[in-house]
Amino acid sequence: MTERSELYKKGLEMRKNLRSEAEFQKNASEYAEDPMSQEFIDVVTETVCGGLWSRPGLDVKTRTLICVVSDIATGRYPELEIHLRFALRQGWTEKELTETMFHMSGYVGVPLVREATFVARKVFAEVRAENE
């Protein structure tokens, strides 16, 4: 087995913190299906999760909201689905996330936020069902 850097180890812990155990295992098995995907998630784990998400200065909850906002502003809806789940897991409420989206409509435009609300509605329903 390859010896992993400290950043990789921090990043792996961060990835586990952001997802439920079931989501983490599903995600890990999807990336393990081929070498390119595995190498990609290893790079993301070390650089993004270990290097950025683990930095001091902002708590993880705030970082999840930054990701939600950046996904909406750039129209990255598949990533928005992931980051909304992270945000809910870190304690943001559906109401707070919805209000964030509404507020953004004045700055990034109604069409981007409209699409984001469709994603959010789906994610909110799935997470509520998973928690029942």
Language-model features: locations:
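Extended intrinsically disordered, low-complexity coil regions enriched in Ser, Thr, Gly, Ala
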Residues: 77-96, 114-118, 123
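A short structural micro-motif
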Residues: 72, 90, 103-110
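Short, structured motif recognition centered on aromatic/hydrophobic residues
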Residues: 63-71, 101
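Short, flexible domain-boundary/linker segments around small modular repeats
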Residues: 48, 100-103
